[in-house]
Amino acid sequence: MKVRAYCSSANLGVGFDVAAVALDAFYDEVEVYVKPGSGQIITEFYGPYSENIPLEDNTALLSARLLLTMSKVDVDVHIKVWKGIPLGLGLGGSGATAVATVKALSLELGLKIDDMKLALIAGLAEKAAAGSPHYDNVTASLLGGLIIIYSLNPLRALRFYPKGYFVLGVPHVKTPPRKTEVMRVIIPKTLSLEMLPPSLGRMAAFVSGLYTNSLELIGQSMTDDI
């Protein structure tokens, strides 16, 4: 079974950890092969961005392991990942790998798992690999379009298809290992009450712009002071 998952951009506007969009600029493609066994998982990476990916602590292996454990299925799995999304540049590359893996494996095994449960598993795999789950990235890659996470327990999301184009600027910079974990250390842990009303207003305008397909309103609401 072969599945493709596209890259994503998250933290749109004031939607920190809740708003993300799938983009067709880059993608990962995952093939899975299963046979009777005891749960052994082998991962193999190739493609333009396959260097320096650990064979043990990667989201393909971790997401497959979580899926097998939660589904109580004992099979051996061979996962081949064509890595077409650059890592460390904020494009949801590790999340896309996890998404393509759980989708391909669930289809190959004939498991009737809904997409939000698959997104949850992919997010948990990212947490194990990088220190924090990115439910916005993985949900966008899995569902497509622009999504807003509105519940974590259970995981739920709204999906939109805004009538516009996204221009993607990818910086050619070297990022540290576990970039997201490093960056989250410098994010403020507390906020002043005065910062809340403008952010809530912009989020309301953002959602309204998505429902009404107003690119002008969406653009006006993208400012984030936090």
Task: Name these PLM-found stretches.
Residues 69-154:
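Gly/Ser-rich oxyanion-binding loop with an adjacent helix/lid
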